[in-house]
Amino acid sequence: MEVVDPNLDPWKHPGSQPETPCNKCYCKKCCFHCQLCFTRKGLGISYGRKKRRQRRRTPQSGEVHQDPVSKQPLSQTRGDPKGPEESKKKVESKTKTDPSD
């Protein structure tokens, strides 16, 4: 074992840090570059704060790409356009006229 200068801080000891800086590459060689690279790249563990994704906001300028709601066509109502009351009356009249029981 090499003799280490006791006046040096532990993180400055020779061999404590790799000669090359860490990079963003995820190849096998770079994953085993140092302990920090191994935990981040090899194991995928990161203890940093997660950044929140910002929602897209509409531009504040007068240029809007959508038509206003008033110009859009009204959606078609499904089913009976007359309404539920008249359809109930039809059902009641059919049950009274059909004595199939």
Swiss-Prot record:
Region of interest (Interaction with the host capping enzyme RNGTT), residue spans: 49-86
Motif Nuclear localization signal, RNA-binding (TAR), and protein transduction location, chain numbering: 49-57
Keywords: Acetylation, Activator, AIDS, Apoptosis, Host cytoplasm, Host nucleus, Host-virus interaction, Inhibition of host innate immune response by virus, Inhibition of host interferon signaling pathway by virus, Interferon antiviral system evasion, Isopeptide bond, Metal-binding, Methylation, Modulation of host chromatin by virus, Modulation of host PP1 activity by virus, Phosphoprotein, RNA-binding, Secreted, Transcription, Transcription regulation, Ubl conjugation, Viral immunoevasion, Zinc
Location of region: Interaction with human CREBBP: 1-24
Region named Core: 38-48
GO biological process: DNA-templated transcription; positive regulation of transcription elongation by RNA polymerase II; positive regulation of viral transcription; symbiont-mediated perturbation of host chromatin organization; symbiont-mediated suppression of host innate immune response; symbiont-mediated suppression of host translation initiation; symbiont-mediated suppression of host type I interferon-mediated signaling pathway
Subunit (UniProt): Interacts with host CCNT1. Associates with the P-TEFb complex composed at least of Tat, P-TEFb (CDK9 and CCNT1), TAR RNA, RNA Pol II. Recruits the HATs CREBBP, TAF1/TFIID, EP300, PCAF and GCN5L2. Interacts with host KAT5/Tip60; this interaction targets the latter to degradation. Interacts with the host deacetylase SIRT1. Interacts with host capping enzyme RNGTT; this interaction stimulates RNGTT. Binds to host KDR, and to the host integrins ITGAV/ITGB3 and ITGA5/ITGB1. Interacts with host KPNB1/importin beta-1 without previous binding to KPNA1/importin alpha-1. Interacts with EIF2AK2.
Miscellaneous remark of the record: HIV-1 lineages are divided in three main groups, M (for Major), O (for Outlier), and N (for New, or Non-M, Non-O). The vast majority of strains found worldwide belong to the group M. Group O seems to be endemic to and largely confined to Cameroon and neighboring countries in West Central Africa, where these viruses represent a small minority of HIV-1 strains. The group N is represented by a limited number of isolates from Cameroonian persons. The group M is further subdivided in 9 clades or subtypes (A to D, F to H, J and K).
Name of the protein in its database record: Protein Tat
Species annotation: Human immunodeficiency virus type 1 group M subtype F2 (isolate MP257)
